[in-house]
Amino acid sequence: MTAETKEHATGSELIPKYSPKGAFVAEVAAAGSRLAQFSIEFSGDKPGEIRAVTDILERHKVNILSGSHESARWSFFVDLSQSDASTAQLVQELKALPDIQTVQSQDGLNGVIVDALHHPLMMGKNRAVLFRLDTIGSVFSRPREIFGAEGPLGKVLLHQMGRAGGQSSLKAFSETMGRDRIREQLPNIMNMYAAGGWGIFKLMEVDFDRGVAVVQAFENFECTTHRGKRGEPYSQYVRGDLAGLFSEVFDKKVDAVETQCVVQGAPFCRFEIAPASKGTA
């Protein structure tokens, strides 16, 4: 992450500068566009492998639209509308490269292509799923609609769902990096929220001995669509997630209280984490 900063659009806090990251899912172009997808497995992980592929694409005037690259594999969408080559021809030329092990491809349908070459979606060693913000917003609104916007049942349900998710996430991190590295890697664990599209979460304070922490969340996905529309803090799922995650970090049950929220007009959501009171859910 660079040290470059910018003023956040919804507040005076200076936060690290982030660039949007597109999910490698689909591409849409004008009707009649010749879209295609390639998924190439390299025989090793050597410098220059991708350059050899892009040389072929450049020679045939193939426009790369988007892609996803990981060790020894590169998947990408292309626009062949101005190209002199067919998908099949490109596959043959790519297969002829010395470091290419396999090449998969598919053609789009009248200017639209959706990734049909990869499953499941993975986050590290764990399977992941994607939801659009409007979709998950509708899902999280439903318990409030059923049990009443201000009633406790919907809030408790969302909070407990979040708590379970946070505990599960931290356990997965522990299995990946080792339990003894969790405290050291807490800044990176906070960065996972941004990487997953949840928002920009900043760890402002932490005291491992007392089991307390303060987190600021910019663009909190649970609240951002209700910005400035409500009088009290709105986040239930995210505060539950933080409570579950930090309960695992501190190895004791803690609660997360949202002390300010963007739905109230604040520039960010602020959560205070502290040991749970006896008898709390």
Regions found by a protein language model. Name each.
Residues S66-R73:
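RNA-recognition motif
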